[in-house]
From Swiss-Prot:
A single active site specifically recognizes both ATP and CTP and is responsible for their addition. This is CCA-adding enzyme. It is an enzyme of class 2 (transferase). One of its GO terms (biological process) is RNA repair.
Amino acid sequence: MDKSLFEQARPILEQIQDNGFEAYYVGGSVRDYVMGRNIHDIDITTSATPDEIESIFSHTIPVGKEHGTINVVFNDENYEVTTFRAEEDYVDHRRPSGVTFVRDLYEDLQRRDFTMNAIAMDTAYKLYDYFDGQQDINNRIIRTVGIAEERFQEDALRMIRCLRFQSQLSFDIAMETFEAMRTQMADIKFLSIERIVIELTKLMRGINVEESFNHLKSLKAFNYMPYFEQLDMNQINVTEPIDLELLIAIVSVKFDINYSLKPLKLSNRQVKDINQYIQIMNALPSIITKEQLKMFVYDYDTNLIKNVMVAADVLKANDIQGHEPLIVNLQTIDETLHRLPMHNRKDMMVNGGVLMAHLNAKSGPWLKDVLRQIEIAIVTGKVSNEETEILKWVDNHVKI
């Protein structure tokens, strides 16, 4: 069992303890340690208040001081240190109206979402498990701490997180937890779409995504999400892990729609990837020659092309025609990419200025068209990417 990340953080806990306070590892890192999984992020919980943490350590960042969280910078690493706290009544099913700092570990752990995430551990690797989290982990069960209805009423995102954990861990959901989700799923309409998208992104990449996605449908979760609410998501099938962006593109192609993505509040990069995925899926079935393959690899991000090809079963499950494997496969994609004479228009040895001077013509719509013709000629091997050769080819093949 790799304890290196815990050992790297140990001096922080020891320094807090040396000042008379309690300190424990908590949350996902402890859960993953119990499961024998790789540890990623270390979270620390303590009886010390934020002010007391700031007085103990010389380099701190008050990232969420009002909620009890201080970042302690130690050996060039950031560690979240959060004070034991009890939360007051929640507002809009998503955030507490306030927090009260407490000195009792049990009181802090009982406010957490699921039993598997409510285990604390000290520097001697002793576990503090008041809610049978280890037993649920051993039985591969996701169960809320306390009454499920209350946990989901406090923060409706916990329902989506539950399905995300199910997808990632291949756990079952406790019956009472699932039934509470069935009756309260409509409350996710109060959440910001940004928080939902973060969870969906992780859910879609989970090894058990098929079951979790089917639960999203059966629990009618999509009915309460912007963008998805206008679609019949029961017609969409996901059989293996894919990017959320690819899912959205599959939805667009399946229903032949061009709905605005603005309600999802995605990044520009995500929107760009979705649009490329759509174009890739629409282009794939028609690629039957090597020249078409060259232009396809040139025009689109090969990582996205590969993602679509690897997801062939998902496309098939949604009645979307895939690629011709003899022409388009992972090997031919890599070989074609390696042999391309150039990878974007910036590599081309002529530009608009050179063309206008050579043809003694003013700028106009013709210019974009001619540059594209040259691009195609170079990529498909009809002319070498040298200025003199390109201009000869233009003289022989282009009319404006």
